[in-house]
Amino acid sequence: MILNTERLLLRPWNESDAESLYEYAKDPRVGPVAGWPVHTGVENSREIIRTVLSAPETYAVCLKGDDRPVGCVGLSTGERSNLVLPEDEGEIGYWIGVPFWGQGLIPEAVREVIRRAFAELDLTTLWCGYFDGNEQSRRVQEKCGFRYHHTCRDIHWRAMDDIRTEHITRLTREEWEAGTASERKDA
């Protein structure tokens, strides 16, 4: 599945993307705030593509006209989610390389995955989370219509082997439909 937005192409990851992934995933400002360790080399990135990023509905975020990934957005439904969710609900996760911060690219990618989740996959509810201190992620979620739902304190985050506080946000299909209707009316 390939998704298009105004500026982005969202496509499945390929093992040949390992060098581009490593370029951004080696930066300690990217992975740890999102809940995963800094990549240690191109082979580590290749293994992550094989074992994590090859999951269904996980997309390499590429600028149109350039097939190299600069970030990632993914949708995990039901049991594949980090949360305990029914099959008609999903969780969205994302990250983008530091050179692309502040350009509105991840909100654009997330909005397209939201559209697919509700309009094509017929999900009823989407969830997102951000760790304490990750204000950029909180703002992405707000821009995309997610609203605060609850906080999980003192959770052991296995990928980083540390204790974290995660804030969970939610967007229902009805909220999304109301928001897209008002956007069409304003246009």
PLM-predicted stretches and their roles:
Residues 39-44, 53-55, 105-106, 157-161:
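Short C-terminal domain-edge/linker segments immediately following a structured domain
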Residues 29-50:
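Conserved GNAT-fold acetyl-CoA-binding loop/helix
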Residues 49-60:
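A short helix-loop-beta-strand connector motif used in the catalytic cores of GNAT acetyltransferases and
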Residues 1-33, 62-187:
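Acyl-donor (CoA/ACP) binding surface of acyl/acetyltransferases
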